[in-house]
Amino acid sequence: MAFQGTSRTLTQQSSAASSDDLQKILFSPDAIKKMATECDLGRHHWMRADNAISVRPLVPQVTSNNLLSFFKSGYDAGELRSKGYMSVPQVLCAVTRTVSTDAEGSLKIYLADLGDKELSPIDGQCVTLHNHELPALISFQPTYDCPMELVANRHRCFAVVVERHGYIGYGGTTASVCSNWQAQFSSKNNNYTHAAAGKTLVLPYNRLAEHSKPSAVARLLKSQLNNVSSSRYLLPNVALNQNASGHESEILNESPPIAIGSPSASRNNSFRSQVVNGL
């Protein structure tokens, strides 16, 4: 995957003349080449026995120098509000194994700040993957913006750290790590808030029900149910009750049907309920 990006976050806070300088810093052929060779952006990095620990900064050294000079000059001249921040919304790492599942080993992958001498994981964002768990897709999200500054003669920026453990007897490549991200630079930093994990319930949706017509039996049952709910029953010598409560009580108190041909059938024939609205 080739490096792609825009300079909107920079050009919105700088003049037109400065925009050309920014595009040269970020998107010149040399800058794009450095992003690939020094940072392995969109490239497969092989984890070997002779390369057990890999620290890949998200910004090349030359690009960091140019950005640091650009923001510092703008800040000293009063044109920019700060000396520059680096933000990375997300770092996506695709990890695949290149040995059989029987190999005993693991990879430890995390996001670090080069300003930290110990290279500790940022807010505990660290993943340990055993060989039999690969392949896997990992996502890291920094929780703050990294200032563009020098710390002990080191350019401060985010970095992806991969450590290989185990794999006794395997001197070659045991896993491949392909990382992708899009770094953004601005004179104004962002505010980050903690969000609790949530769950969204997704109900199944029957799309065929919209295009299929109900059967004749289903239509008949539906019409009968509608008529029963709106019908009024009239008993002999009983006035018609227009209230809903009276209607419900009459339905509940209705006598069970009498079998045709029984001795009481003719005697009770005149006492059958008469349906006003009809079924």
Swiss-Prot record:
Q: Polar residues compositional bias: what residue ranges?
A: 267-279
- Transport: is it a keyword of this entry? yes
What keywords appear on the UniProt entry? Host cell junction, Transport, Viral movement protein
Q: Mention one GO biological process in which this protein takes part, according to its record.
A: transport of virus in host, cell to cell
Give the UniProt entry's GO cellular component terms.
Answer: host cell plasmodesma
Q: Where is this region: Disordered?
A: 256-279
Q: Does the keyword Mitochondrion apply?
A: no
Return the similarity comment. Answer: Belongs to the cucumovirus movement protein family.
Query: Can you say where in the cell this protein is located?
Result: Host cell junction, Host plasmodesma
User: Where are stretches of biased composition, namely Low complexity?
Assistant: 256-266
Function, as annotated: Transports viral genome to neighboring plant cells directly through plasmosdesmata, without any budding. The movement protein allows efficient cell to cell propagation, by bypassing the host cell wall barrier. Acts by forming a tubular structure at the host plasmodesmata, enlarging it enough to allow free passage of virion capsids.
Recorded source organism is Cucumber mosaic virus (strain S)
Name recorded for this polypeptide: Movement protein
